[in-house]
Amino acid sequence: MHPAGVGGQVQEVALLHVVAAVDAHGELGPEYIATAVELLERTGAANVGGIMDAQGTTDFEKAVAAAYTSRLGLGGGSFHLKNSPEGPADTVFLGVYRKADLLAVGGFDPSFDRAQDWELNYRLRHSGREVWFSPRLKVTYRPRSDVKSLATQFFHTGQWRRQVIRTHRDSASLRYLAAPVTVVACAVG
């Protein structure tokens, strides 16, 4: 999400009262930030985010996009499923944060190269703040274009998700453990 060494300083340089996470593979719609600010004000949440609307252009990318939006593909997180209702969430895709809440919990942890949002949302929730999902917020996401890039992405995501669990043991959930448990079970036979 953030280039190495930058994530920890983003919140200090933000000029306004919100900090928006942006991903190189995501395309925010023209009203994304305005809608997010309205949701922050209406809900009182510390972070709001929405649908990761995966769309591919090649057959491979379309297949990956279909897997991303399947309950079986990435575990059925609300931000992957278009029919998910608005409400509190463990995490959201490309959140828009209240700067004051971000600073109150120490901001993005620069020791995480990836999974900063998962880790930060954990700290926000455990400080009594709310993370809010709304399907009104939609980001077009462009999946990796080949098997090698996708495998590399998932490998690194898994490494950093494991680090979040090591740092915050009670953040482990079946959704994140299902894939590695399945792989180990298949390998053991």
Residue ranges, per PLM feature:
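A conserved catalytic-core signature of glycosyltransferases
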Residues: S84, P88-R98, D109, A115, ...
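Short, well-ordered alpha-helical scaffold segment located
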Residues: A100-A104, K138
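Alpha-helical bilayer-embedded segments of polytopic membrane proteins, i.e.
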Residues: H168-G189
